C-alpha cells in the first residue's frame, strides 16, 4: 500500500525508539539524537511552522548546510503540509531569489547570518516570503525569527491539529522540489517529487546496500 514520507518516518521512529537516528558533532564530540527525540523534534517544529503561518501547499526553502536542524525542518515542513526545496549554500543572492520565488516559499530557513544577508539583499523581490528562520545568529530585521523564537509558536497549535495535516497528505501529493545547480546563472531545472516517488527512491537505495532508513 502506498504511503507518505511522514507515515514512513513515524513508523520508523516507533520501531527504532531509543536507537540513534542522527549524530551531531558538538565541541569535537559526537552527540546522538534518538529516533524518539527526532520524531518529537519534528512534530514540535511542524506545529511551530503551522503557528507561524505555514499553510498547506506553501513552499518552504532551506538555505543551509546539512545538519540536524536541516533534516528536522525539512520533515516538519512536509508534516505541516508544506513543500520543501533545498538551495545550494553557494548560491548568489539572485539565485536564491529565483528558487525562493519559483517554489512559492512563504518561509525560508537559513543557518547563518551570511546566508541571511543573501535573502535580505533580495527581500524586495520576494512578495510571497513572510518569514525567515535563522538557526544560528541574531537579527533585528523584520520577519526574521531565530530557531528558538520559532519553537514558541508550537504552543499555538495542538497535536490534533498537526495530525489532521499529516492525515490529509496523500501518496501522490507533491512532497519536495529538487533544483539543479545553475553553472553561470539560475537553476536549469526542477524535479517535482511526490511522496510515493520519494519512497521508491529510498527503497531502491536501500536495496543497493545503502540503508537510507532502518
Segments (PLM) and residue ranges:
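AMP-dependent adenylate-forming
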Residues: 8-33, 135-142
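Structural core segment of the AMP-binding/adenylate-forming
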Residues: 9, 51-52, 79-152
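Conserved pre-ATP/AMP-binding loop-to-beta segment of ANL
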Residues: 17-20, 134, 139, 151, ...
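Conserved AMP-binding/adenylate-forming core of the ANL superfamily
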Residues: 22-75, 92-97, 146-154, 194
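Conserved AMP-binding A3 loop
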Residues: 32-36, 175-199
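Conserved structural elements of the adenylate-forming
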Residues: 39-44, 171, 190-211
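Conserved S/T- and glycine-rich ATP-binding loop of Class I adenylate-forming
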Residues: 60, 77, 108, 174, ...
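Helix N-cap/beta->alpha junction signal
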Residues: 64-66, 112, 173
Amino acid at each position: 500500500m502506498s504511503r507518505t514520507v511522514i507515515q514512513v518516518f513515524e513508523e520508523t521512529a516507533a520501531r527504532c525508539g531509543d536507537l540513534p537516528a542522527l549524530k551531531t558533532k558538538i565541541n569535537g564530540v559526537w552527540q546522538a539524537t534518538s529516533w524518539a527525540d527526532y520524531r518529537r523534534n519534528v512534530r514540535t517544529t511542524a506545529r511551530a511552522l503551522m503557528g507561524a503561518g505555514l499553510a498547506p501547499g506553501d513552499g518552504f526553502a532551506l538555505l543551509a548546510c546539512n545538519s540536524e536542524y536541516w533534516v528536522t525542518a525539512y520533515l516538519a515542513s512536509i508534516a505541516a503540509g508544506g513543500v520543501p526545496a533545498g538551495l545550494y549554500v553557494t548560491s548568489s543572492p539572485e539565485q536564491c531569489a529565483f528558487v525562493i520565488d519559483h517554489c512559492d516559499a512563504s518561509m525560508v530557513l537559513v543557518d547563518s547570518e551570511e546566508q541571511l544577508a543573501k535573502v535580505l539583499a533580495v527581500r524586495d523581490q520576494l512578495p510571497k516570503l513572510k518569514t525567515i528562520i535563522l538557526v544560528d545568529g541574531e537579527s533585528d530585521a523584520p520577519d526574521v525569527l531565530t530557531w528558538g523564537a520559532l519553537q514558541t509558536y508550537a504552543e499555538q497549535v495542538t497535536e490534533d491539529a498537526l495530525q489532521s495535516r499529516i492525515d490529509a497528505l496523500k501518496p501522490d501529493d507533491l512532497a519536495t522540489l529538487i533544483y539543479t545547480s545553475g553553472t553561470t546563472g539560475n537553476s536549469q531545472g526542477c524535479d517535482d517529487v511526490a511522496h510515493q516517488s520519494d519512497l521508491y527512491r529510498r527503497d531502491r537505495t536501500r536495496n543497493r546496500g545503502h540503508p537510507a532508513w532502518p
